[in-house]
Amino acid sequence: MARRPAAPKRLNAANLTGLGADRLGDLLMQAADADPILKRRLRLILAAEAGADALALELDKRLTAVAASRSRVSWRKRPDLVRDLSVLSEGVETLSRLAPAEGLMRRMVWFDLFRGLTLRVKDPRGEVADLFETAAPALWQAADAAVRADPAVAEALAQAVQDHPMDYARWIGAGGEALTPDLARRLLERLDTASGVRGMRTAVRRLADRADDLDLWLSLATPEERGSPDFAAVMARRLLIAGRVVEARQALEGALSPSPANRRWTFGRAPDGPLRLTPAWEAASIDLMEAEGRKDEAQGLRWAMFERDLSAPVLRAYLASLPDFDDVEALDRALAHAATHADVETALGFLMDWPAHREAAALVERRIREVRSPLPLKADWAARLAQKYPEAAERLLASPG
C-alpha cells in the first residue's frame, strides 16, 4: 500500500521549506523581534556567512556587553542567560573553524566571563557552572587547532592560565582527552611551574598529568599528600606503570604508620592482626608485590583482605592468580569462611551476590537470629531463594531485619 503523504499542517522542516524563503524570512523576523536571544543568534549566523572578520566583530560586541554588565541575574532570568551564553559559544565554535587563532582568543574571552557571572548570578543548581565545564573540551580543541596553525598562540593561552590559575585548573580537569599531551607540554614550557600563586599548583599538576610528565607531577606532592595512604597508592601505581618499582615501594612506605622502618609490617599487617591501611593502599601494595616477583606474599595479602572484608573483587583476583584446579578448593574455603564471618549481614550479602545460594540458605537456617539491623534487600534475596530453598526464604522474610 502506498504511503500517505505527510500532513501539510505538521510542523517539520519539509513543510516549512514549502512556505518559501520570503515567507520564512518574515516569520523569523517576527520571532526574532519577540526573542532578543534568537535575534542575536541570527545576527551571528549572518555574520558567519560574511566571513571570519564579520563574525569576530559581532562576537566581540556581545562578549564585551556581557563582561561589562553588573546587574544581578535572578533565578527567573538565569535560563535566558544560559541560552545567551550557549548561543555565544556556538558562534565562537564557528569562528574557530573559520579562523582558529581568532576563535581561540574569543573562546578565552568567553571563559573569562565565568568569574564575573559567579558574583552576580543566582545559580543554586550549578547550571551556569555546568555550561562552562561542558564547554571545556571545546576550549582545548580550539587551542590545539590554533597552536598547530600558529605555535605563538600558545603564549597567550599560557598567560591566561598564569593570570587565572584556579579557573583554568577547573577547565583543564574538565577538558579530558581534548587537552592533548603535546598542548599540555607546550603550556608547561611557558608557565612558572614553581609559582606559589593560589591554584597554580593544581593547574600545573593537571597539565603534568595530561603531558605524562611523571617527575613534575610527583614534585608537586605535598608532605601531607605523601603521608596519605590513598594518595600514596596513586603515586605508587603511576610509578609502577613507568617501571619505577623501587620508587613505588618508597611511595607506599611513605604513608606507613608508625614507622616505615618496621619492615615486618611494611604492607599493613599490624602486630595485633587486622590490616590497618586503606583498600586503595592495600591494592597498590599487591601490585607492587607482583612487580617485585613476590607472588606468594601478594596472594597472602589478597586472602587476608578477603577474610576481613568479604570483598568479591579481591576474591576473584585471588582465584584468578591460582593454578588450574586449585581455584575450586580455594573457592570452597572462601565460601566456608564467609559463612562464619562475624558480621552476618555482610556474610549473607556476599553469598547472595557471588552467587552461592546454597551456602546463603544454610547461613539463614543457622544464623538468622543474629540479624540486628534492617536488610534492605531481604525481599529480593528471599525471592531468589524461594524456588530451591523455600524454608530459608520464609525464615528470611520473617526475620526482624
Report the location of each language-model feature.
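Eukaryote-biased, non-catalytic alpha-solenoid scaffold regions
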Residues: 1-401
